[in-house]
Amino acid sequence: MARIAVLCGTGMSALASQLASAPGAAVNTMRVDSEWGQVPATLVSVDEDEVLIIDRHHSDSGSRTPPHGIEHRANVHAAASFQPELVLSINSVGSMCEELPPGSIGVAADVLDLAERPWTFYDDHATHADRTSCFNSGASEVCAKALEDTQGQVASGLVVAQCVGPQFETPSEIDALERLGADVVGMTLGPESRLVAERGILHVALVCSSNWAAGRTPGSPEAEIDHDTVDAMAATMRESVGECVKALLS
């Protein structure tokens, strides 16, 4: 039996329904208690495998927690309480990498997180988690192979820059991040990678290119970034994400 916890957000609201469409699948919704608040989650069981899906934004019909307001400790605590073999983060990003145009999915290898806010489970006792290899190479390779079957070329080994949001970045910020080694930029993976490392769980991250980063749209460097368009683009990649989940379970 395989158990995977999935942390997802933009464009992935129907991921649980997609996985639940498999023959014999069962779906249960639940709320996981934590000292940082309750976390809504969906458990999808297929044969002997289980996938716990957590919408990091805790979206419902009336509201959606903005990226800077997400309580990542609650989400990662809920994921860890499931005792998964692996945590899969699915992150919508802006791309500054020609090999990762909007509509394609890449595989993260590292995080560039210089945000000032600390994220830790250990506020009262100094505990230092190693982050030399944030993401499991074996699981990353499984995802890359699954993506090759669905989209062909796959950008892997990507460095994900963390920005706090909720505003999109400026072209100058993107230029600076690229000089520091970033390939893509997002608003959620940095805290998740820190907290998953503290819990000692294997981690893999898919980056869904939903837009060109600010100032990087080919032929139109002044093109604006619109969240509705970003969300719609992310949703087009949901089936490929589902194939990665299936590959990780096998």
Labelled PLM ranges:
Residues 134-179:
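Active-site rim beta-loop-alpha module in soluble metabolic enzymes
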